[in-house]
Regions:
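General nucleic-acid-binding
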Residues: 1-6
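Short, Lys/Arg-enriched anionic-surface-contact patches
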Residues: 7-27
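Short amphipathic alpha helix immediately N-terminal
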Residues: 22-38
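C-terminal flanking helix
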Residues: 63-72
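Key DNA-contact positions within bacterial/archaeal DNA-binding proteins
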Residues: 54
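Short alpha-helical "recognition helix" segments of helix-turn-helix
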Residues: 44-49
Length: 73
């Protein structure tokens, strides 16, 4: 599930910081910010975090609905 995010970087950053919680949340927040705010590709993020592209995509797609829901409220 991929959404077009038409919100300010500040609002996206706040939603990610406030609603991405749990195990490995810090890493997941950084990955989401790299992609949705800084515009890095999944390949660039995977290299940066020493992960596979598949892992990065899974983190992004699994967590996207969580913070997107809070952008709409």
């Amino acid at each position: 599930m991929k959404h077009k995010i038409n919100d300010s970087a500040e609002n996206v950053r706040n939603a990610i910081d406030n609603y991405i919680i749990g195990f490995k949340a810090l890493r997941n927040r950084e990955i989401l910010k790299d992609h949705y705010i800084d515009g890095l590709t999944f390949e660039e993020i995977a290299e940066k975090h020493d992960m596979s592209v598949r892992q990065v995509k899974k983190i992004a797609y699994d967590n996207e609905p969580v913070f997107i829901e809070h952008l709409r409220t």
